[in-house]
A protein has these predicted regions:
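Hydrophobic cores of alpha-helical transmembrane segments in multi-pass inner/ER membrane proteins
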Residues: 80-91, 137-150, 219-226, 280-295
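A loop-to-helix transmembrane entry motif
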Residues: 70-79, 202-223
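Membrane-interfacial loop-to-transmembrane alpha-helix junctions, especially the N-terminal start
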Residues: 39-40, 97-110, 237-245
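Membrane-interface interhelical connector segments
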Residues: 191-207
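Short, Lys/Arg-rich, polar N-terminal cytosolic tail immediately upstream
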Residues: 2-35
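Alpha-helical transmembrane segments of multi-pass integral membrane proteins
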Residues: 42-53, 136-153, 164-191, 212-220
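Membrane-interface helix-loop-helix junctions at boundaries between adjacent transmembrane segments
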Residues: 91-147, 154-165
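C-terminal transmembrane-bundle signature of multipass membrane proteins
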Residues: 213-308
Length: 308
């Protein structure tokens, strides 16, 4: 009886699919907030307008038709705009496009500072050749502010704030500044109302009202107080507003110290007591400002970003 010899079955080797090559490590790229293109374009236009106005103000002082002290104040303000505010805003715009959250706060604050001074220039300075630029700056600053605010996620900012940030101390600082300057301005206004005269800040000037007091009491100080209260209560909008107002107040303190010094240079009869006060205020305000900005934990994202 013959048997057929069968070879043992060949066991097929099962191969694992080849592993894809490991990509080289790459540095994560931060993502810009969606919709920043419009804010960028408006802010670039704002920077160009203010740069032109600043250069003319600093190097062609005869453009002003105001008394020497007030013209000196304006030159001091535009010196700060040229040397501090505009470089800070351009740097913040560059960083924001690359996704740095804290840069948005600096950008907002710089726009707010330029808006503040556009209002002062438009309504306080005597009509001069730069008036169209003052109006253009006012319009562009408002548009830039609105466009940028639409791009910022206050909730993300709040979630990214480090628990190490002394929020109650920062909030208290903001509320003290708001209440303190409100009392200072009211001390100038209320006695004049009761006596039926003009405030002391207007005596010896050609101004009909004090535009600084108007802007501060109507906008700056209420926003500063709201920032402090909301931050104290842990609201997301408080983080956005507090960070913005901290940078703004520091910029404004530097600006006032500088414009008062330039006013004294133009008219030595003008006191310099405010210079030292605002230098100290700027130095003190820089401490919570830096601590707050450093306390924002920057997120890392994928390699692409969409900008509308």
């Amino acid at each position: 009886m013959s048997t057929t010899r069968r070879d043992p079955p060949v066991r097929r080797r099962r191969f694992a699919p080849p592993m894809p090559p490991t990509p080289p490590p790459s540095r994560p790229v931060r993502v810009a907030p969606p919709g920043t293109t419009l804010a960028l374009r408006l802010s670039i236009a704002l920077a160009v307008v203010d740069a032109i106005a600043g250069l003319v103000s600093v190097f062609v002082p005869d453009v002003f038709r105001d008394d020497p002290a007030y013209a000196g104040n304006a030159r001091g303000t535009y010196t700060v705009i040229l040397l501090v505010a505009l470089p800070a805003m351009v740097l913040a715009m560059w960083a924001s496009v690359r996704g740095w959250l804290r840069a948005n706060l600096v950008w907002l604050a710089c726009i707010g500072y330029l808006l503040y001074n556009a209002i002062l220039s438009s309504f306080s300075l005597r009509f001069n050749a730069l008036f169209p630029l003052y109006v253009a700056s006012l319009s562009l600053a408002v548009a830039s502010l609105v466009a940028l605010l639409r791009c910022i996620d206050a909730g993300m900012l709040a979630r990214r704030l480090s628990p190490r940030v002394p929020v109650h101390a920062v909030a208290a600082y903001l509320m003290v500044i708001a209440v303190g300057f409100a009392l200072l301005w009211l001390a100038d206004i209320v006695p004049a109302l009761l006596a039926g005269t003009v405030p002391a800040s207007l005596r010896g000037t050609t101004l009909t009202t004090n535009a600084v007091e108007v802007i501060d009491l109507a906008f700056t100080l209420p926003l500063t107080l709201a920032a402090g209260l909301w931050l104290w209560r842990g609201r997301a909008m408080g983080v956005l507003l507090a960070g913005t107002m901290l940078v703004f107040l520091t910029l404004e303190a530097i600006s006032v110290a500088t414009d008062q010094y330039f006013g004294h240079l133009a008219d030595p009869s003008q006191p310099t007591s405010a210079v030292a006060f605002f230098v100290v205020l700027a130095a003190v305000g820089a401490l919570p400002t830096v601590a707050f900005l450093r306390g924002i934990i920057e997120p890392l994202h994928g390699p692409t970003a969409r900008r509308a």
